[in-house]
Amino acid sequence: MVRIAYLGPEGTFTEAALVRMVAAGLVPETGPDALQRMPVESAPAALAAVRDGGADYACVPIENSIDGSVLPTLDSLAIGVRLQVFAETTLDVTFSIVVKPGRNAADVRTLAAFPVAAAQVRQWLAAHLPAADLRPAYSNADAARQVADGLVDAAVTSPLAAARWGLAALADGVVDESNARTRFVLVGRPGPPPARTGADRTSAVLRIDNQPGALVAALAEFGIRGIDLTRIESRPTRTELGTYLFFVDCVGHIDDEAVAEALKAVHRRCADVRYLGSWPTGPAAGAQPPLVDEASRWLARLRAGKPEQTLVRPDDQGAQA
């Protein structure tokens, strides 16, 4: 049985993302009847369970369209024993503002919210519950639990969590931006990446020596090969003030020749490169990397001992005429 830790408790958007991954066949060697879901209190705890051997995979949020990257996930991937991403899925996210049955907005003095969720409904709360004292929650489901336990008057949560805790909605479909989406990833211990699909993402963490032009030179290795970078983000190393790691996402797979060549070149330039994986994205995340080019075919002919193709210059053609 495959054990998957996820940001819990039951009823989170992360659980919904995990259900979608399983249904889409993105979880290796499993099916609905061969899966043990393990809710934990945070994304770092889910990743720690994989590192410790308590889980085979972790399903965690990594990015949302309103507040950007989920920093606890990024930081946990950058440090400790290396882990690898094997799959992703994206959910359209809207929230419910919930209370105990029989309560209304006038009763709300305190409100629990997962910080990522609070950022996505900030304007709505300011307009409709401006006097509510915001209390942090470990997850959207934990926010609902706090209402059920009488710790707060209301919560920002998922419809699934609201139903599981028997809560009433003051408002459904709440989100400041109508196109709010959150991306979730499936993370496990290092292994062979999923097969190239032609719609893939590759991610790495770069540790670059503090020298003039070093970052530009590293990133140029992708640009000169026609590789589409979809995310560049810095995070502190946590070892010395003013030193940073750089998260880089690109379109393509490690089995794409252009991506492989770029990774090799970056490895030569950087103090360290942590490969986070290559995995399918479903819809293409950007411009696909170029296929094998003429220079590669030329090199392959040389290695095989085949004769070189003779190039005919326009001047030569005129002379022959």
Swiss-Prot record:
Allosterically regulated by all of the three aromatic amino acids (phenylalanine, tyrosine and tryptophan). Inhibited by low concentrations of aromatic amino acids and highly activated at higher concentrations. Ionic interactions are required for optimal activity. Pathway: Amino-acid biosynthesis; L-phenylalanine biosynthesis; phenylpyruvate from prephenate: step 1/1. Optimum temperature is 37-42 degrees Celsius. Its EC number is 4.2.1.51. It is an enzyme of class 4 (lyase). GO terms for molecular function: amino acid binding; prephenate dehydratase activity; protein homodimerization activity. It catalyses: prephenate + H(+) = 3-phenylpyruvate + CO2 + H2O. GO terms for cellular component: cytoplasm. The record marks T182 as: Essential for activity. Was identified as a high-confidence drug target. This is Prephenate dehydratase. It comes from Mycobacterium tuberculosis (strain ATCC 25618 / H37Rv).
